[in-house]
Curated annotation (Swiss-Prot):
Keyword hit for Transport: no
UniProt entry keywords in alphabetical sequence: Chloroplast, Plastid, Transit peptide
Record-given protein name: Plastid-lipid-associated protein, chloroplastic
Gene expressing this chain: PAP
Tissue localization of expression: Constitutively expressed in flowers, leaves, and fruits.
Location of this chain's protein in the cell: Plastid, Chloroplast
InterPro entries, sorted: PAP, PAP/fibrillin_dom
Annotated organism of origin: Citrus unshiu
GO cellular component, as recorded: chloroplast
Keyword Transit peptide: yes
Length: 323
């Protein structure tokens, strides 16, 4: 709506009286009287007051131009923009969001729990307990669509995994990823560990079936083990030079030798990678366990095993996995 000071800029038309005559006369205005919403009584009163004077005060009728940039149309557009801004307001951060962030931050430097100090473990246990008390999915086995995903292990207190996580167990190899893939339609679980070395990567996994035993608990029976086919690196990158005892050694003469070695390595890599994975059955009747899901939402899962060990998983692709 235009301010009073801005009305001086609006196009106006002046109705003035002819001095020689006492009777009120005016030229036809480009703006009809009713276009500025002046009532008949007001117009009549103005006319009578003018008749009593030889020189009447001019009656000024104003009307805002149609192209007023502050007019109703602009206000309408502004209101729409405000509505859009309200719809795009950021999601409110809840107490659960803060607990999840604090829990994930506490995993930093622990190598999935292997290097966690007693103080850090106590902090993690406290955060897990608080999250379990606020579990948004009290019956996880009745929400199988949430369970149906690939879950990345980010922390565990299961000591049986620590020798595997230790670098001394497998020289020149490191654990790249530990995951659990749940297929709720076929009631299957696949536990997988991926290893990475300087020249190859491989994986070891177990396939199992699960049965729902309670709103939080499932029984798992392992059926098959799989050793993945090693994916051999078929290319080696040789630097231009290396520094040894304070001197730079030029390695360009060795590039010709490396090229012939790479051709052989590429052929070997293709041969090995084309082989099928090695599978073996698990027929031991004791190869089973149960799993209790104590917290579950769209990107975080906390489970406890039969020995009381805790496992914290984050769904693959979740923003929580980003550093």
């Amino acid at each position: 709506m235009a301010s009073i000071s801005q009305t001086n800029q609006f196009p106006c038309k002046t109705l003035s009286q002819n001095p020689p005559h006492n009777q009120f006369t005016s030229k036809p205005s480009i703006l009809p009287l009713n276009s500025v919403r002046i009532s008949r009584s007001l117009a009549k009163k103005s006319f009578l007051s003018i008749q009593g004077f030889t020189r009447a005060r001019p009656l000024v009728l104003t009307r805002a131009a149609d192209d007023d940039e502050w007019g109703p149309e602009k206000e309408k557009e502004g209101g729409g923009a405000l509505a859009v801004a309200e719809e795009e307001s950021p999601k409110e951060v809840t107490e659960i969001d803060n607990l999840k962030k604090a829990l994930v931050d506490s995993f930093y430097g622990t190598d999935r729990g292997l290097n966690a100090t007693s103080e850090t473990r106590a902090e993690i246990v406290e955060l897990i307990t608080q999250l379990e008390a606020k579990n948004p999915t009290p019956a996880p086995t009745e929400a199988l669509t949430l369970l149906n995903a690939k879950w990345i292990l980010v922390y565990t207190s299961f000591s049986g995994l620590f020798p595997l996580l230790s670098r001394g167990t497998l020289p020149l190899a490191r654990v790249e990823e530990i995951s659990q893939t749940i297929d709720s339609e076929n009631f299957t679980v696949q536990n997988s560990i991926q290893f990475a070395g300087p020249l190859a990567t491989t994986s070891i996994s177990t396939n199992a079936k699960f049965e729902v035993r309670s709103p939080k608990r499932v029984q798992i029976k392992f059926e098959e083990g799989v050793i993945g086919t090693p994916q051999v690196t078929d290319s080696l990158v040789l630097p231009e030079n290396v520094e040894f005892l304070g001197q730079k050694i030029d390695l360009s003469p060795f590039k010709g030798i490396l090229s012939s070695v790479q051709d052989t390595a590429s052929s070997v890599a293709k041969t090995i990678s084309s082989q099928p994975p090695l599978k073996f059955s698990i027929s031991n009747s004791n190869a089973q366990s149960w799993l209790l899901t104590t917290y579950l939402d769209e990107d975080l899962r906390i489970s406890r095993a039969d020995a009381g060990s805790v496992f914290v998983f984050i769904k693959e692709g979740s923003p929580l996995l980003m550093p």
